[in-house]
């Protein structure tokens, strides 16, 4: 026995790998790695992080409690995690050209909740985009806390263009006088006019909050206009197009607002921050500050346009007629299909996406009339325009098979799955 470990069990505790200690969990992780490696990921809110980001999350920082903020902690021994969090904050501020950042929210939903806790009172009126039009649960959807604790008024999209109608947003704001207006969402394929939202907010003396979770990577590189010159406060996730760990962040240029935000995040909503995740955020922000990240985002957008164009040639109806961003909504009604059945058929063929409501959808949320597709993950593993042309045609083949048979075309799905696996083998993950 090693003399440095009087208790023999400790020697194993600090040295034995997961594969030797927990077969069941290790097997689940390996199975998920195989799935990611052999399937094409088109879920718009997912991405593939670098090995460095993954390594940061698997460090000893997971052991450290650090309630409070750098230099003002409730626990001792925080000098090194203070350094890491300070790096994350400074990189976030540089990346988005803003004055203040809070990198502690565990998720985008937590970030949105913290903003409301900081700046609103229960019962206040908020104006956000409806879920079916492309908004998010946290923007006032009835089943969510934001729809229960606040008087949530929802704006949608124009019935003709299927884009935001700013005159309609203004009319709702003038009618309901919201305390907060929320811009952004989870399924908006077109550029958002943040300046117009600020004009409307100022007209009714409302706070403008922008949720840029889906387009943060695009904003960081200048591929989408930044909300920071216009919004009072901006929230985001740190995954999606930003290609970092799963987490949230809050940005602002207003000192009075960041003081309220910091108190709302801790102690208002959260306890100890996840320091290993904050370290990974810092790594991801550092990556996003490099020139390669702009090239990546440019490819994400170009690949999305290519995919949308191919799908249109295959008879698919793309909501708004195309995309300016990383995602698109496919309206399946012209093909007589439901989103849930399309999702299932595509997954059988090795292509992962999600069923999604479309504007003015009459189907239930677990059925839907559409699917949402995104290019961030595929682009991260190296897919370019030629690969996305293939992917678009594979999707077309699978959907056509579903049109001809409600259970799908097993022969087509098997053939596509084989071709998908062959393509993925040329672009392996984490070698």
Curated annotation (Swiss-Prot):
Catalyzes the reversible interconversion of serine and glycine with tetrahydrofolate (THF) serving as the one-carbon carrier. This reaction serves as the major source of one-carbon groups required for the biosynthesis of purines, thymidylate, methionine, and other important biomolecules. Also exhibits THF-independent aldolase activity toward beta-hydroxyamino acids, producing glycine and aldehydes, via a retro-aldol mechanism. GO terms for cellular component: cytosol. SUPFAM superfamilies: PLP-dependent transferases. The keyword Amino-acid biosynthesis applies. Its cofactor is pyridoxal 5'-phosphate. Its main location: cytoplasm. The gene is glyA2. This is Serine hydroxymethyltransferase 2.
């Amino acid at each position: 026995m090693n003399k440095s470990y009087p208790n023999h069990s400790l020697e194993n505790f600090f040295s034995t790998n997961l594969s030797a200690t927990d077969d069941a969990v290790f097997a689940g992780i390996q199975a998920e790695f195989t799935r990611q490696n052999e399937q094409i990921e088109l879920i718009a809110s997912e991405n593939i992080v670098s090995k460095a980001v993954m390594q940061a999350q698997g460090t000893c920082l997971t052991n450290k409690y650090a309630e409070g903020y750098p230099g003002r902690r409730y626990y001792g021994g925080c000098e090194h995690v203070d350094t890491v969090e300070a790096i994350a904050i400074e990189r976030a501020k540089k990346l988005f050209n803003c004055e203040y950042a809070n990198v502690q929210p565990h998720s985008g939903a937590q970030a949105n909740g913290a903003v409301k806790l900081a700046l609103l009172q229960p019962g206040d009126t908020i104006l956000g985009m409806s879920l079916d039009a492309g908004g998010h649960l946290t923007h006032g959807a009835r089943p969510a806390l934001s729809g229960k604790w606040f008087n949530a008024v929802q704006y949608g999209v124009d019935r003709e263009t299927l884009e935001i109608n700013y005159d309609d947003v203004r009319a709702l704001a003038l009618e309901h006088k919201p305390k907060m207006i929320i811009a952004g969402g989870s399924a908006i394929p077109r550029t958002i006019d943040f300046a117009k939202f600020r004009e409307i907010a100022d007209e009714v003396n409302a706070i403008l909050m922008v949720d840029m979770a889906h387009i943060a990577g695009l904003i960081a590189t200048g591929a989408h206009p930044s909300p920071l010159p216009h919004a009072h406060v901006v929230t985001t996730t740190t995954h999606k197009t930003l290609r970092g760990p799963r987490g949230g962040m809050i940005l602002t240029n207003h000192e009075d607002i960041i003081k309220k935000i910091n108190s709302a995040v801790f102690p208002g909503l959260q306890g100890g921050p996840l320091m290993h995740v904050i370290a990974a955020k810092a790594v991801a922000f550092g990556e996003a500050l490099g020139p390669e990240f702009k090239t990546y985002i440019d490819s994400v957008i170009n690949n999305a346009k290519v995919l949308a164009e191919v799908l249109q040639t295959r008879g698919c109806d793309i909501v708004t007629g195309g995309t300016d961003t990383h995602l698109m909504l496919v309206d399946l009604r012209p093909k007589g299909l439901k989103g849930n059945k399309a999702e299932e058929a595509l997954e059988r063929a090795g292509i992962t996406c999600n069923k999604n409501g479309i504007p003015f959808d009459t189907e239930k949320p677990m059925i839907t009339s559409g699917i949402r597709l995104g290019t961030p993950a595929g682009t991260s593993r190296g897919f370019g325009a030629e690969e996305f042309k293939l992917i678009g045609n594979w999707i077309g083949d699978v959907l056509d098979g579903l049109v001809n048979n409600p259970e799908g075309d097993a022969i087509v799905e098997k053939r596509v799955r084989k071709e998908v696996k062959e393509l993925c083998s040329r672009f392996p993950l984490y070698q």
